[in-house]
A protein has these predicted regions:
Chain A
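Sec-dependent signal peptide recognition
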Residues: 2-8
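Eukaryote-skewed repeat-based solenoidal scaffolds used as protein-protein interaction platforms
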Residues: 148, 173-174
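Electron-transfer interface patches adjacent to heme c in soluble/periplasmic c-type cytochromes
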Residues: 21-73, 84-146, 153-157, 162-163, ...
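A mid-sequence, solvent-exposed acidic-amphipathic segment
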Residues: 174-184
Length: 276, 156, 103
């Protein structure tokens, strides 16, 4: 039996090597080409605006509101959290690569030692634990949400730069990819049903945002006040297709974020923004 | 039931008195402002009462007022609205949402060089007209734009 | 610290003043999602702005100005260096005020 599995595994590697076209980069190019072919008028950089890129009326409201965002106070609160030292006197900036600046586009990152994907939120919690603090729950908007609404702005302008360059990383990427393309929930939708195949179409009053660009602008403030992180948005999407959601920070959600973030490679980060 | 009706009648009566007073020039707009919050107008539950409460009954439609508001609101809780009045000596810009529980939203008195321009963000409860009223040189003008409000949203 | 942020700059002959005020702007019609009780009305009902000591804007508001209100107005005849003061008062009698210099 063991031999058989080993044989299958080696076959997989050989097969993987032959089917080189199924690399993460070719997956991304397929997605980008599909969208560019369907919407030749939309510039690649405008995918950061999501559904707004398809609707000038909506985009002009976004521009008006972003001129003086109503949620600046929350971001200031996040800044205070970021700057307040841990009980041992150390800070997030001291604990993170490059002082926490211009790094969010490298995350999620596959950690070879841990054998799993580490998100920017996980990196924050690693800092907390290393400095003797309790980790935050990734789904708690009052702590992790508020903190990242500021911490992610420190990487504004950096281009998304996700790497998938080891067998373990490919496995996590494929896991996320499977979740993205697989239909599930009572309504039998895949993420791809709305955010790739039907991206840019209207679903009743909603324009569906394309997967390319979805990972670069979270957290969002819906209606100008309701703070939502990317994985909290996954929870919302899962509920909409009537699928029991994971807790933000689950391996499955982290792998999905890894795949989705790779799909946004090359786009500039811009946190935290208004959404409807 | 009866009580409610009585209160509405009372409210309407008070607003009518204000309107008559304003119409007769007994109250100068500036004085109204330095004084109390225009409770009757702000708590009015229909457009006619609200318009009467701000002394804008019979306002003339004007193409010199531009109401810049979206066709479809992204989110009814924050709808950007810009009002530009090209009418000389614009003294007041007033914003109403005809389908809101209380239609009157804001009354801006402008003076000492302030342009006939206001930009803000308002709440809209339902699809309907966003109306601007402009007071200038003792006259009252108005213009409106319909804004559709939908519920839900993906927030992506 | 004031909860009002002001950006004021000259644009041609006009001063463009933008401000954001921290305020929940409760209409009094909204129900608390958990308790089902109406949230009492709590909104800014009076806003004034002065430029170089002269009142340029004197406004009355209802509860339907969005939470954390945004306001922009333009003033002719103002100049770089003039002081802008923006103040508000709400239906509970709370007050706030802030100033800035036109850039």
């Amino acid at each position: 039996m063991k031999k058989f599995i080993l044989a299958l595994a080696s076959l997989g590697i050989v097969f993987g090597a032959i089917a080189a076209h199924a690399s993460p980069e070719s997956d991304r190019m397929k997605v980008v080409n599909f969208l560019e072919h369907k919407y030749p008028d939309i510039k690649f950089d405008d995918y950061v605006y999501g559904a707004l890129a398809f609707d000038p009326d909506a985009k002009s409201q976004y521009d008006s509101i972003m001129d003086f965002p109503p949620f600046l106070d929350v971001i200031d609160q996040g800044k205070k959290m970021w700057e307040t030292p841990f009980k041992n006197g150390k800070t997030y900036a001291e604990c993170m690569p490059n002082g926490g600046k211009m790094i969010a586009g490298n995350y999620p990152m596959y950690d070879e030692k841990l054998g799993k994907v580490v998100t920017f939120e996980d990196l924050i919690n690693q800092c907390r634990v290393k400095n003797g603090e309790q980790p935050y729950s990734n789904g708690d908007m009052k702590t992790m949400g508020v903190l990242t609404s500021y911490a992610r702005t420190l990487s504004d302008g950096m281009k998304m730069n996700i790497k998938v360059d080891s067998p373990g990383a490919v496995k996590a990427f494929d896991n996320g990819k499977n979740l993205f393309y697989k239909r599930h929930g009572q309504l039998n939708f895949a993420c791809a049903s709305c955010h790739l195949e039907a991206a840019g179409n209207r679903l009743r009053s909603e324009i569906l945002s394309p997967v390319v660009g979805q990972a670069v602008h979270f957290p969002v403030f819906r209606g100008g006040s309701n703070l939502v992180t990317l994985q909290e948005r996954f929870v919302g999407c899962f509920k909409m297709i009537r699928q029991v959601p994971d807790q933000p920070g689950s391996t499955r959600f982290n792998d999905l974020e890894y795949f989705m973030s790779y799909m946004s490679n090359g786009l500039p980060l811009h946190a935290s923004v208004f959404r409807k | 039931m009866n009580n409610e009706r009585r209160q509405i009648l009372k409210g309407a009566g008070a607003a009518a008195v204000v309107a008559v007073a304003a119409g007769a020039g007994l109250l100068k707009p500036g004085n109204v402002f330095a004084a109390d919050w225009n409770k009757a107008a702000f708590e009015a539950k229909d457009v006619a009462t609200a318009m009467a409460g701000i002394g804008a009954t019979g306002a003339a439609e004007s193409d010199q007022i531009v109401v810049d508001a979206p066709n479809i609101a992204e989110n009814g809780s924050r709808v950007p609205v810009k009002v530009t009045s090209k009418i000389a000596n614009t003294e007041h810009i007033i914003i109403l949402a005809e389908k809101n529980t209380n239609p009157l939203i804001a009354d801006f008195a402008l003076s000492n060089g302030a342009d006939g321009f206001i930009s803000t963000a308002i709440k809209l409860g339902a699809t309907g007209n966003v109306r601007a009223v402009v007071k200038a040189g003792g006259k009252v003008y108005t213009a409106a734009k319909e804004v559709k409000v939908t519920i839900g949203g993906c927030g992506g | 610290m004031s909860g009002i942020r002001i950006k004021a700059a000259m644009s041609g002959d006009n001063a463009v003043v933008k401000c954001l005020m921290q305020h929940p702007m409760e209409t009094g019609f909204r129900k608390d999602a958990k308790t089902g009780q109406l949230i009492p009305a709590h909104f800014i009902n009076h806003v004034t702005a002065t430029v170089a000591g002269k009142t340029v804007l004197d406004a009355q508001w209802g509860g339907a100005i969005s939470a954390n209100p945004f306001l922009e107005f333009r003033v002719a005849g103002a100049k770089s260096g003039d002081q802008v003061v923006i103040s508000w008062e709400d239906n509970k009698g709370e007050k706030d005020s802030a100033d800035a210099t036109i850039a």
